[in-house]
Amino acid sequence: MLFNIANSVGKRTVKFAQSVGSFSLFSFAAVSSIIRPPLYLSLIIRQLLFIGFHSLPVVAMTTFFSGAVLALQSYIGFSRFSAESSIATVVVLSLTRELGPVLAGLMVAGRVGASIAAEIATMRVTEQIDALYTLSTDPIKYLVFPRVITAIITMPCLVLIGDIIGVMGGYLVGVYKLDFNSAAYLTSTFQYLEPIDVISGLVKAGVFGFIISIISCYSGYYSGKGAKGVGRATTSAVVNSSILILISNYLITELFFKV
């Protein structure tokens, strides 16, 4: 009994160590490919549209209603302490520091991460990646580099737009439903907002973009065989990206806002 438990734990530990080592080497190869030609500009532009522009509606809807419900719930809670004037400040700080980057990251992980993993996994199953080797083309440079660099660039843009839309959602609820004065609400919104609040959110967005793209590419690149392998790669990409987004969010928050 004890031998079986020790054997199982040992196998899982070795497998985990192998996965960490494989992922580290894959990440290093992807990052180092940035400085090596060619740039594949056409692929980068295509990924800019897919990861950035096509993700904008999802991020916009998510942040708009998050800002709206945050304003509504803050009013319900703060009205008990006669602190309704702080609602706008809470909305803008919550969105720029936490909700904007995290929600955008989770939405992009679900939409883009799954698609990237499924696409590359399908290429692995159909031996298209092997065909790239025969054409003297580096698969990591051709498949991974455009997606990673594009995700790092587009995520801060998506988060910045999402923050603005989320604040707008809170503004509409505050002014038109809760009967706040428009000028007073806007003044309260920007009164305590500092550059570090926005910068920290954009840094998080860039890190989240790297996490989503590199994990999704890795999951697809090393997927199993057949349809089951593609499905597992897709699930692994979304789940692992989401978990690492939440973990890195705390670490970056700790780095920027030490208590």
Swiss-Prot record:
Its main location: membrane. One of its GO terms (cellular component) is ATP-binding cassette (ABC) transporter complex. The chain crosses the membrane at residues 13-35, 49-69, 148-168, 195-215, 237-257. Pfam families: MlaE. It comes from the Bacteria. This is Probable ABC transporter permease protein RC0129. Could be part of an ABC transporter complex. It is found in: Cell inner membrane. The keyword DNA repair does not apply. One of its GO terms (molecular function) is phospholipid transporter activity. It is a multi-pass membrane protein. Belongs to the MlaE permease family. Keywords: Cell inner membrane, Cell membrane, Membrane, Transmembrane, Transmembrane helix, Transport. The keyword Cell inner membrane applies.
